[in-house]
Design a protein with these regions (language model features):
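Extreme N-terminal starter segment of soluble prokaryotic enzymes
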Residues: 1-3
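A short, glycine/small-residue-rich beta-strand->loop->alpha-helix junction that serves as a flexible
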Residues: 5-15, 38-39
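Short beta-strand/turn micro-motifs composed of small residues
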Residues: 6, 34, 151, 192-194
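Donor-binding and catalytic core of enzymes assembling or modifying cell-surface/extracellular glycoconjugates
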Residues: 10, 175, 179-232
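Short amphipathic alpha-helix
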Residues: 15-23
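A short, Lys/Arg-enriched amphipathic alpha-helix followed by its capping loop at the start of a domain
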Residues: 22-28, 184
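A short beta-strand-loop structural module common to alpha/beta enzyme folds
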Residues: 29-40
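Secretory-pathway luminal glycosyltransferase catalytic domains
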Residues: 43-185
């Protein structure tokens, strides 16, 4: 059996689930481990069922028991300890019967050969969207120059994240991105998503901008749905 640890918010869960789909293609006895999600309070829990109606494939036990079982019986495979751009550790055959995978798999190389299945799996359930998001969907589908601009601040500006993400959360990064997009799209319409809309309005004044600020809490996934309907 292969167990794949799930943690993080919706985006990370999607990467991990895509990795699970690929693993399942070659190794039918694979399950998703939600044990850590029982204690994860940063985001909104495991969202694959609620947002995408994906089937239940989970394994979940209490944390102390899980750690004992993991230590005694499972061989651990860590994404961060593997060679860059190498899938060998995930594809090789192991004699150890129980394998435990930890990582975020934030690259299409982990599931490029099943990209159609991944896209089909991540189909948003529009029936669960609120009225404002549904109205915005109609606008986006008619706007041929719709450009989504997601500006994440908050946790990414904390010192512990600075080495990996801090540099892409600074004003020049977004200014350069807007300048580049203006070269590629004639009269772009910017649909802006952010966890700090006030900062965006003050620091990135745009003439043709719509600020999406109503999807909070368990409705946060609707921002991603709206982004997927932008042309860029």
């Amino acid at each position: 059996m292969r167990l794949i640890k799930v943690t993080g918010g919706l985006g990370n869960q999607m990467f991990i689930y895509a990795f699970y789909l690929r693993m399942k293609k070659y190794y039918p006895k694979v399950r998703i481990d939600l044990s850590d999600m029982m204690h994860y309070k940063v985001h909104y829990g495991y969202e694959m069922h609620r947002v995408f109606k994906l089937p239940h494939t989970e394994f979940c036990i209490n944390r102390p028991l899980k750690k004992i079982i993991e230590f005694l019986f499972f061989k651990k495979i860590y994404e961060r300890k593997q060679a860059p751009n190498s899938l060998r550790a995930f594809e090789k055959k192991y004699f150890w019967p129980l394998l435990y995978f930890k990582g975020f798999y934030q690259s299409e190389r982990f599931f490029a050969d099943i990209k159609d299945e991944v896209r089909e799996s991540f189909t948003f359930d529009k029936h669960k969207a609120n009225s404002r998001s549904l109205n915005m969907l109609e606008i986006l589908d008619k706007d041929e120059n719709a450009v989504s601009l997601h500006i994440r601040r908050g946790d990414y500006l904390q010192p512990k994240h600075w080495a990996t993400t801090g540099s892409v959360c600074q004003l020049p990064y977004y200014q350069n991105a807007i300048a580049e997009m203006s070269k590629r799209v004639t009269s772009p319409s910017y649909y802006i998503f952010s966890d700090d809309i006030v900062w965006v309005r003050e620091n990135l004044p745009l003439q043709n901008a719509v600020y999406i600020d109503w999807n909070t809490g368990e409705d946060s996934w609707q921002d991603m749905m709206l982004m997927s309907h932008c042309k860029l």
